[in-house]
Curated annotation (Swiss-Prot):
GO biological process: queuosine biosynthetic process; tRNA wobble guanine modification
Pfam annotation, one family: Queuosine_synth
Protein name according to UniProt: S-adenosylmethionine:tRNA ribosyltransferase-isomerase
Enzyme nomenclature, EC number: 2.4.99.17
Its biological purpose: Transfers and isomerizes the ribose moiety from AdoMet to the 7-aminomethyl group of 7-deazaguanine (preQ1-tRNA) to give epoxyqueuosine (oQ-tRNA).
Annotated gene: queA
Keyword Repressor among UniProt keywords: no
SUPFAM superfamilies: QueA-like (SSF111337)
Family: Belongs to the QueA family.
UniProt keyword list: Cytoplasm, Queuosine biosynthesis, S-adenosyl-L-methionine, Transferase
Quaternary structure, from the entry: Monomer.
Transmembrane domains' residue ranges: none
C-alpha cells in the first residue's frame, strides 16, 4: 500500500489544543471492525462495552518534562528534547539550533526557569545520526531531578502552543508510574479514577505494560511504499504477570483490550518474540526495544479490541488502526469523525474498535 492511501483532509479547527475539563467526557466513536458499523458515544460509555472478565492492558509510562531551552557556550540559542535516558547522567536528545553543536560543546540549559547565568551545564559527547548524546557536567544530581526543575512538558508539535502548568497533570495518565516517555500514551488520558473504579467493580481485570513513547512517534513517514518505512525503536517491558493475565483471559474465552497503540505494540511484540523463539505460549515476557511496524496485512496475535485516539493522516498509527479494523472501515470512520466534528490527536476524542 502507498502512503497516500492513508491521507484524509482534516480541518485545522478539529485539532484539539486543550483537553476536555473532565477526562471521561470526551466523545467516543465505536467501530465494529467486522461490519464497519459506527456508533457515536461518550467515553464514559466504555464501561458498557467492556465485560466482566475482560482484560484491559494499560501503558504505565510517565511523561517526563523532556524539553529544555538554553544556549551554547558561544551564545547561540538551543532547544533540547530528551529522547531516551541512558542512565542518571547521560541521555540521547534531539537538538534544534541554527547550527548543530560539535563534539565537546558545552551547553547551558534551563536559564528560562533558573535565571540568566544559572543554567545547568551539559556536554555534547557524541552524535548518533539524528540524536545527540549529552552528559551532565555535575554528577551530584540525577537527570530526572534536574528535568523537574528546568524541563517543559513536551507537547506534540501540532498542539502549537507553549506548555502550561495544567499540562503537567493533563498530559499524563492517572495511573502513570515509570518515568521515561516524551509523549503521552494518549488513549489512557480519557480514564479517570471514577471510571477505573467502576470497571474494577464490574469485574474487569487490569494489566500494565511499559513502553516509553519517544519523539519518533511524531516523525512523518517519508517513503511512498509503506513497507519500506523503518520504524523508530522504543523500550518495552511486558512482565510475567502480564503474560499470565493474558493467557488466563484467553483461556476463559474473554477479551484482551488494548488501551492505546503503545499497548498493542507492546503485547504484539511479546507475541512475535514468542513465535520467533518457537515458544509453546501465545506470548512471553519481553524486556527490550521494539520497532514493530503494524500495517494492513499484518496479523494480530493477541489483541481483540482497541481503545485509541484519532491519529494524523499518513501516520504509522492510522496504518495500525487500519490493520486492526480493516482499511476501508477505518477510512470511513475517520470520514465520519471529521463530518461529525470529533476532536483529533493527543487531547482529542477516542475510538473503541473491535477487530475485523
Amino acid at each position: 500500500m502507498y502512503l497516500s492511501d492513508f491521507y484524509f483532509d482534516l480541518p485545522d479547527e478539529l485539532i484539539a489544543r486543550y483537553p476536555k475539563r473532565e477526562r471521561s467526557s470526551s466523545r467516543m466513536l465505536q467501530l465494529n471492525g467486522q461490519n464497519g458499523e459506527l456508533f457515536h458515544r461518550t467515553f464514559s460509555d466504555v464501561a458498557d462495552l467492556i465485560n466482566e472478565g475482560d482484560l484491559l492492558i494499560f501503558n504505565n509510562t510517565r511523561v517526563i518534562p523532556a524539553r529544555m531551552f538554553g544556549r551554547k557556550a558561544s551564545g547561540g540559542k538551543i532547544e533540547v528534547l530528551v529522547e531516551r535516558v541512558l542512565n542518571e547522567h547521560h541521555f540521547l536528545a534531539h537538538i534544534r539550533s541554527s547550527k548543530s553543536p560539535k563534539e565537546n560543546t558545552v551547553l547551558f540549559l534551563g536559564e528560562d526557569k533558573l535565571g540568566e547565568g544559572k543554567g545547568v551545564e551539559m556536554l555534547m559527547k557524541a552524535r548518533h545520526e539524528n540524536l545527540f548524546e549529552l552528559e551532565l557536567s555535575d554528577k551530584s544530581t540525577a537527570l530526572l531531578d534536574i528535568l523537574q526543575k528546568i524541563g517543559h512538558m513536551p507537547l506534540p508539535p501540532y498542539i502549537d502552543r507553549p506548555d502550561e502548568d495544567a499540562d503537567k497533570e493533563r498530559y499524563q495518565t492517572v495511573y502513570n508510574k515509570v518515568p521515561g516517555a516524551v509523549a503521552a500514551p494518549t488513549a489512557g488520558l480519557h480514564f479517570d479514577d471514577e471510571l477505573l473504579t467502576q470497571l474494577k467493580n464490574k469485574g474487569v481485570n487490569f494489566a500494565f505494560v511499559t513502553l516509553h513513547v519517544g519523539a519518533g512517534t511524531f516523525q512523518p513517514v517519508r517513503v511512498e511504499n509503506i513497507e519500506d518505512h523503518k520504524m523508530h525503536a522504543e523500550y518495552v517491558e511486558v512482565p510475567q504477570e502480564v503474560v499470565d493475565a493474558v493467557l488466563a483471559t484467553k483461556a476463559k474465552g474473554k477479551r484482551v483490550i488494548a488501551v492505546g497503540t503503545t499497548s498493542v505494540r507492546s503485547i504484539e511484540s511479546a507475541a512475535l518474540f514468542a513465535e520467533e523463539n518457537n515458544s509453546t505460549h501465545l506470548l512471553e515476557p519481553y524486556f527490550s526495544d521494539t520497532s514493530i511496524f503494524i500495517y494492513p496485512g499484518k496479523k494480530f496475535r493477541v489483541i481483540d479490541c482497541l481503545i485509541t485516539n484519532f491519529h494524523l493522516p499518513e501516520s504509522t498509527l492510522i496504518m495500525l488502526v487500519s490493520a486492526f479494523a480493516g482499511y476501508q472501515h477505518t477510512m470511513n470512520a475517520y470520514k465520519s469523525a471529521v463530518e461529525n466534528r470529533y476532536r483529533f490527536f493527543s487531547y482529542g476524542d477516542a475510538m473503541f474498535i473491535t477487530k475485523a
